Amino acid sequence: NRKETGIWKFETTPRMSSYLLAFVAGDLQGVTATTKNGTLVGVYSTKAHPLSNLDFSLDIAVRSIEFYEDYYGVKYPIPQSLHIALPDFSAGAMENWGLVTYREVYLVVDENSTFASRQQVALVIAHELAHQWFGNLVTMKWWDDLWLNESFANMMEYVCVDAIEPSWNIFEDFQTSGVPAALKRDATDGVQSVHVEVSHPDEINTLFDGAIVYAKGSRLMHMLRRWLGDADFAKGLHAY
């Protein structure tokens, strides 16, 4: 029976793609921190979870942003980075600009969470934060080049987590986990290439082939990174 009403006013966004706009409303709780360059980072969930279950993800998010800023040589583009665990969410996570949404399993970490699940949470957060530059700050003219967004992000999630948690040796997983599926899928007659022409919006959802756009595309990017060397590759990304 609440009768309060109000008008919410938001700051004007930078120029952005409409598919990256999100709103979240609910009875939420959260933890916050600030990066060394002053970006406000927050992780939120419903009150069904202890507040301490958000600490791991907050730490990963802060350090991931700081890593990407150093690696790309480009500051995080907007004032805040909020991460929300949703009780019911069809996607794994979505890189809405400044308001990333997740399934709870990819953001909430409790004392019984396995090491593997913690690694997965870190990779998903790093993936969505990579998109804040690849896909959000720099967006393709059309969906034909979706693979660039997802391939970069899929590779960079491993580069990032390997840098902030070197003892995990996470890049060993990158070099093996997605390769068999990508090779098998790529050998199928009529399989799509990483770059697919899109003539109608109804075709967009067909592009999200995990074995091709994510696994194969990210390995192609890694081949380029190894061929150029990490320093020159990073310089190229800065120009990009």
Which residues are covered by each model-predicted region?
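Non-catalytic architectural context of zinc metalloproteases
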Residues: 1-59, 79
